[in-house]
Curated annotation (Swiss-Prot):
It comes from the Bacteria. Coiled coil: none annotated. It is found in: Membrane. Involved in the biosynthesis of the exopolysaccharide acetan, a water-soluble polysaccharide involved in production of bacterial cellulose (BC). Its EC number is 2.7.8.31. It is a multi-pass membrane protein. It is an enzyme of class 2 (transferase). It catalyses: di-trans,octa-cis-undecaprenyl phosphate + UDP-alpha-D-glucose = alpha-D-glucosyl di-trans,octa-cis-undecaprenyl diphosphate + UMP. The chain crosses the membrane at residues 81-101, 110-130, 155-175, 183-203, 344-364. It comes from Komagataeibacter xylinus. This is Undecaprenyl-phosphate glucose phosphotransferase. Its main location: membrane. Belongs to the bacterial sugar transferase family.
Amino acid sequence: MGIISHSIVQCGKWQAGPARRQVVFRVHRRCFKMSEALRHLKNGETDLSSLPSGLDSIPRRIHTARGVDDSFSYRHPVLPQVVVLSDAFCVCLAVVACIAWQRIYDTPDELSGALLLANIMAAGAFFLFPKNVPLLDIPDITKVSVQIRYLLPPVAFGEVVFCTVLVMLSWPFGVTVRMGMEWLTFVVAILFVERCVGTYILHTPTMTRRLARKVAIIGSGSEATQMATRINTRMQRMFRLVGTFDDQGGDSDGTVEELVLRAREDHIDAVIICFPPACGQQHVMDVLWRLRGVLADVYVVPSLMTEDCHGWPVERFGPFSLTVLQRRPLSEWDMLEKRAFDLTASVLLLLALAPLLTLVALAIKLDSRGPVLFCQPRQGFNNRYFNVFKFRSMYTDMSDLDAARQTSRTDPRVTRIGRWIRRLSIDELPQLFNVLRGEMSLVGPRPHAPQTRAGGQLLHEAMEEYVARHRVQPGITGWAQINGSRGELVTRDDLCRRVVLDLEYIRAWSIWLDIKIIFLTIKREIFSRNAF
């Protein structure tokens, strides 16, 4: 949130140095009314004096910190949800097996409907019963006592519902104890087999390496050494140390800048800042500023946060209690959910739009010489480069792969068909193939070519917060586009408005927001006046 707020500050007085960063992270710990700021920005009021007054008096952000206890466990971001889905599948399988068994056992026809309804309602009761999902942490998921605590209440509740429904619907025909025990036996047996298989899989070396979170430590001295030693000895099943980094050199594996570059190539889940207490909080804030584009959770030893830090959440990280400074914008589960939606929607769209795509390709081929598709390098997720697909809308000998010159409304490089498909945004449709390849999402910040400039500067130079856009997959459309921020980036203010909207989308992401943006794109943006 602090990066979003600072994006607005960036639109006004262009400051630099530690003083500006201190302002940024003060705002980072406060709730900022983005709607008011966006309203002023849309009206063209980019000076700080035009923003709502009292920015420094905004109430402190409220965090609901996870309880800190002495348990030596670690919450994997995806595993609990996978176990819940596996339980749901097993219960459905148990219901099917129970119904099949009851038919084989020559159940009276009068009871068939009642048994079917009782099985279904019991399964629903199991799903709806509140479960203690934190009990699915590593290594608790392999403990029998913990799993009994997790499974016993919903199974018992499902059994009660089964028996109650069966008695209410079939009391004239009589109900035997056997019928009540059948549901319980099948559910318990299948869940038991599931847990045995799951425990075996979790203990395999391959799965252990996959589930372990990759951790990097920033710092030097005894504190960093102690942290690294503990991770390498007592926490090997939960965490894997990728290295220690520090600008002072010594025995470290590189500098902070080298860590930032390495994070682009090698997935890193968490970064722990572990400086000696003498370094102070300001040094921590400077390092956090340099990590603003890193796709990882950032923690710090609480002893370094001595100044006005009680608003920051504290989490258990193995045996350590660490202060959370920065979170990944989307969890692994959120990313899986978004990816599943992208794949499903893009396949359906390609099938539905196949006739239109064929006609457009034929028109481009007849209109001018050259290929139908145009590939251009763009900077995407985690600052990695990929080739984006578009319908060719320019003459082949005038194409600009690096986008050193942005397209203008009366650009002579655009063909006749190209002007039409650009106006209707049809030239972007081949990017559905980028979505299938995993390089893009349907909704997200629009990717830019490496040499795109705003106000005569490269985008990442014109606005330091620009790199934070790359912490999520780029999209075919986005929140900025449906709010009118598209087209040519002429000034830094144009870039600022777009980045503010992109970061607001990242902060507020949900599947429903993606669906809303897609429908608003169809409604508003296809005939946008800013498209050319």
